Amino acid sequence: MYLPMGKDSIPDKMIISLKKAAAKQGGLYRQDVMIYEMLARGDWKRPMYMSVTLGSDNYAGLDNYLVLEGLAYRVTPFNYGQMGMIDSNLMYNNLMKRFKYGNVAQKGIYMDETTGRMCETHRRMFMMLADNLNRKGEKAKAIEVLKKCKEVIPDYTVPYDDDDSQLAMLWMFAGDNKEAARVAKKVLDYDTQFLIYLNSLSQEQINTYARKCYFIVSSIIEANQALSKTGDAQAKQYEARVQSLLHTPSMQLGMEIYQQQMQNAQ
């Protein structure tokens, strides 16, 4: 377990707000009480983990006590004040050396929907680790992580979509503008094609994709920004493609939600 200030820093007790935990998920449930019981009796002799694929309303109010180590959050006695803490050394070892990725990189392999989603989860973990390393100034290790991600979860078997716009930024921050531009263009291809498809539907049908429209607009903004900063020769061409969709129904719906989210965040 990662100890922020050494073994002497382990607190004597954890203070968990049951009120906040109950409010977040509409009440306390038996599984929450079971988690608290395990924490009370476990005395940190055995580690306790929570899967990254769980919704945060399943964390029993322990969000600020979780540290990401790979595909799971480890429950710790430390209150970090926010969710999203990463043990970069342990996570690096898990993603780069311990985890096995099967035949995902084999060209022509069939990827069913469930397997594809799991691969996307793994890719997201690579991205979170690379982002953490970039922020700590460890660009060489960040590049290693991004290259490993590209090697074991290539886009020819798990295509880039609106979830991968940050990947372009990460390549750019790590110093590889060529790969950043390649990823950004793949993401923008997906985003614009999906919007074009949505625009072929009725407004009522488009409205059912409101959340997706928001994610795509967010993705377009980030990927377009990354592409423009790389100095790629096709950057203006992609910018023009995005501009041509600005006044279409799906883009406008996504922009409305995006602007609302930005206002709420202020």
Q: Could you say what each language-model-derived stretch is?
A:
Residues 1-266:
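ER/secretory pathway lumenal C-terminal domains and tails of membrane proteins involved
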